[in-house]
Amino acid sequence: MTITSTQVYIALLTALIPAFFALKLGKELSK
């Protein structure tokens, strides 16, 4: 099974988007 750059990009997005929202939510709650 070969990993293409597109699959890496999608994997990064799926990892980063929830992390970004969690960070944004955490900043809102700490105010």
Curated annotation (Swiss-Prot):
What is the membrane topology here? Single-pass membrane protein
Grouped into one coarse class, the protein's main location is plastid
Q: Which Pfam families does the entry mention?
A: PsaM (PF07465)
> What keywords tag this UniProt record?
Chloroplast, Membrane, Photosynthesis, Photosystem I, Plastid, Thylakoid, Transmembrane, Transmembrane helix
Q: Which InterPro entries match?
A: PSI_PsaM, PSI_PsaM_sf
Q: Does the keyword Membrane apply?
A: yes
Could you give one GO CC term from the UniProt record?
Answer: photosystem I
Can you say where in the cell this protein is located? Plastid, Chloroplast thylakoid membrane
Q: Which GO terms describe its biological process?
A: photosynthesis
Transmembrane regions listed in the UniProt entry: 7-26
By sequence similarity, the record places it as follows:
Belongs to the PsaM family.
Q: What is this protein called?
A: Photosystem I reaction center subunit XII
Instruction: Please tell me the species this chain comes from.
Output: Euglena viridis
